[in-house]
């Protein structure tokens, strides 16, 4: 049963957001990183992002039960009741906010709460079922994750904003490549996503271009602010792999090629974030 509640928190999704917050802190603090603060930020990040994910599961239980990709989730499968899921999401979220305020201060808590709002309220409730721009607007939750870590050590500045934009620029290609191969699911429940709103040829071009933009943006940003050989050992292979996967999907589009692109986007972002860490500590 405990495992089902953990699934509500989407650990396979939120770990990148938690890592983004840690990267924000490490990038700002450099060699002065406090290991205790890293642990506290990890706990707070897991609770707050997990709480918003659990709320998303609760709110979308109706469409999750109709989509092949999601019908085995805890609520549609009957393993967790909607009321218990809602109660769990509220309890976990409030725990995250409270610990954030006690451990990390009001500004960090404000940024974390802003990220929660963008995902749980703005994206999940207000936008997802109304416009294909849902992830474009709701994607600012990713910025908030990284910035919440940054302001633990420094005020927000141009570098922090540009660094947080890595997450924002990465999100559309990540989500829409999934939506491309799962477009029948999204059509079934009338959720507007780019691949369900434009023709297939346009979808392929837009998603591929956005993925290339995301990859190149990471490389350029690393060159501008980090530019250390040890980091390039991670960034350059990630860049090349991302370009190859994207070109293959562009030349020969299929559900499988876009599934491959989707699966590649997370490791590419991970390698960039790890490069930032090893370049700053």
From Swiss-Prot:
UniProt enzyme class: transferase
Phylogenetic lineage: Archaea, Thermoproteota, Thermoprotei, Thermoproteales, Thermoproteaceae
UniProt membrane topology term: Multi-pass membrane protein
Subcellular location: Cell membrane
Catalytic activity: heme b + (2E,6E)-farnesyl diphosphate + H2O = Fe(II)-heme o + diphosphate
Record's protein name: Protoheme IX farnesyltransferase
Keywords: Cell membrane, Heme biosynthesis, Membrane, Transferase, Transmembrane, Transmembrane helix
Stretches that traverse the bilayer: 13-33, 38-58, 85-105, 107-127, 132-152, 161-181, 206-226, 227-247, 261-281
Function: Converts heme B (protoheme IX) to heme O by substitution of the vinyl group on carbon 2 of heme B porphyrin ring with a hydroxyethyl farnesyl side group.
Cellular component terms per the entry's GO annotation: plasma membrane
Designated gene of the protein: ctaB
């Amino acid at each position: 049963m405990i495992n089902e509640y953990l699934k509500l928190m989407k650990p396979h999704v939120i770990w990148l957001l938690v890592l983004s917050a840690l990267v924000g802190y490490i990038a700002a603090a450099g060699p002065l990183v406090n290991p205790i603060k890293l642990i506290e930020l990890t706990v707070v990040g897991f609770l707050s992002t997990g709480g918003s994910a659990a709320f998303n599961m609760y709110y979308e239980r109706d469409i999750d039960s109709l989509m092949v990709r999601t019908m085995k989730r805890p609520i549609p499968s009957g393993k967790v009741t909607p009321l218990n899921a809602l109660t769990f999401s509220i309890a976990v979220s409030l725990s995250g906010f409270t610990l954030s305020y006690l451990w990390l201060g009001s500004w960090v808590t404000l940024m974390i709460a802003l990220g929660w709002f963008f995902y749980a309220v703005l994206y999940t409730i207000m936008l997802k079922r109304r416009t294909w721009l849902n992830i474009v607007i709701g994607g600012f939750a990713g910025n908030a994750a990284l910035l919440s870590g940054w302001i633990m050590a420094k005020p927000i500045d141009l570098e922090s904003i540009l660094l947080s934009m890595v997450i924002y620029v990465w999100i559309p290609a990540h989500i829409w490549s999934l939506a491309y191969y799962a477009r029948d699911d999204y059509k079934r429940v009338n959720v507007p996503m780019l691949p369900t709103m434009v023709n297939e040829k346009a979808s392929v071009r837009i998603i591929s271009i956005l993925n290339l933009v995301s990859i190149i943006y990471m490389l350029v940003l690393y060159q501008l602010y980090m530019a250390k050989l040890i980091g390039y050992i991670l960034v350059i292979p990630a860049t090349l792999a991302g370009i190859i996967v994207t070109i293959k999907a562009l030349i020969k589009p299929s559900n499988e090629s876009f599934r491959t692109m989707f699966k590649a986007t997370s490791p590419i972002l991970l390698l960039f974030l790890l490069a930032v860490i090893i370049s700053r500590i």
